[in-house]
């Protein structure tokens, strides 16, 4: 008989840096999941990513307290800030520009996000990411 799903937990955890402190510990603890087991598995799965990069994860908790998880690609905003070399987006994106991204960088981010985004094709994904960049106060070149 298949295991019954008890809960889905969505978190953003720094790649390679999962530990039992908040937000991971409380979110998993309330469902009775072995927190250290998750932390070890998550850190092993994300060791190929840049350490500290915020990585969305969806954890499926079953009624026998076992779990599975799926990692997603980092948010487009995080990848854009990294590409532009800025710490945060602009508070006033229409008047105050904080950095620049090139078309090649947007192409690279679109290819990275292709697994998670539901865009029809790579060009649609590029337009979506360019829109995110503009709303953060980044200038898109190209």
From Swiss-Prot:
Pfam families: Ribosomal_L11, Ribosomal_L11_N. One of its GO terms (molecular function) is large ribosomal subunit rRNA binding. One or more lysine residues are methylated. InterPro entries: Ribosomal_uL11, Ribosomal_uL11_bac-typ, Ribosomal_uL11_C, Ribosomal_uL11_C_sf, Ribosomal_uL11_CS, Ribosomal_uL11_N, Ribosomal_uL11_N_sf. SUPFAM superfamilies: Ribosomal L11/L12e N-terminal domain (SSF54747), Ribosomal protein L11, C-terminal domain (SSF46906). Transmembrane segments: none annotated. GO terms for biological process: translation. This is Large ribosomal subunit protein uL11. It comes from Vibrio campbellii (strain ATCC BAA-1116). The lineage of its organism: Bacteria, Pseudomonadati, Pseudomonadota, Gammaproteobacteria, Vibrionales.
